[in-house]
UniProtKB/Swiss-Prot annotation:
Keywords: ATP-binding, Kinase, Nucleotide biosynthesis, Nucleotide-binding, Transferase. Signal peptide: none annotated. Coiled coil: none annotated. Disulfide bonds: none annotated. One of its GO terms (molecular function) is ATP binding. GO terms for biological process: dTDP biosynthetic process; dTTP biosynthetic process; dUDP biosynthetic process. Belongs to the thymidylate kinase family. The gene is tmk. It comes from Methanosarcina barkeri (strain Fusaro / DSM 804). This is Probable thymidylate kinase. It comes from the Archaea.
Length: 205
């Protein structure tokens, strides 16, 4: 039986990575022996290239293709084999982040960047079975990022407002897959809500 792919999405500072770390320690989730991963990947040729691009003034198309190459490698080396072995895979960011972020970075280069990037992936990516969208006002996310001293070029107010709008559009277009989480609440509260939704999903599937 094919495994299940669960993804956590949201703008920077939404708290999804904090909850992803909590899920790795949660006994109810650990009982399923899931595979935890993230995008961009870490410690890989493609993932390292993406991280360098994020920290530099890389051309928007070059940046997209680096992210996409990392996604392809991630699918081939980890996600597909795990799913074929019946594993549950939980990924901190996945293809929806590319649609949302590159949908904004490419808006001055393409007429409809969101659909263009989605079309680029459509024939070969794996659509998640369940996606949590950690929704938060960009003003709050920027404040959080500033406190941890990790603000990047993607963490500007107008940019994040656009990214958030695309994330919410993706969720509205696919309500069967997306669960929208109010990410302004405490990580502990959100963890309980996410665990509850995951257990409900797995009991049905």
């Amino acid at each position: 039986m094919r495994g299940k792919l669960i993804t956590l999405e949201g703008i920077d500072g939404s708290g999804k990575s904090t909850v992803a770390e909590k899920l790795q320690k949660n006994p109810e989730i650990k009982a399923f022996k899931p595979v935890f991963t993230r995008e961009p990947t870490r410690g890989t040729l493609t993932g390292d290239a993406v991280e360098k691009a994020i920290q530099s003034d890389t051309d928007q198309f070059a940046e997209l293709f680096l992210f996409t190459a990392d996604h392809a490698e991630h699918l081939a080396k980890l996600i597909k084999p795990a799913l074929e072995n019946g594993k549950i895979v939980i990924s901190d960011r996945y293809s929806d982040s590319r649609y949302a972020y590159q949908g904004i970075t490419l808006k001055t280069r393409l007429e409809n960047p969101l659909e263009w990037v989605k079309d680029l992936h459509r024939s070969w990516t794996i659509v998640p079975d369940l996606t949590f969208l950690f929704d938060i006002r960009p003003e709050i996310s920027i404040e959080r990022c500033g406190k941890r001293g990790e603000q990047s070029k993607f963490e500007k107010l107008e940019f994040l407002q656009g990214v958030r709008a695309i994330f919410l559009k993706l969720a509205a277009d696919d309500p069967e897959r997306f669960v929208v989480i109010d990410a302004s609440r405490s990580p502990e509260y959100i963890e309980k809500e996410v665990v509850k939704k995951i257990l409900e999903f797995l009991s049905r599937n």
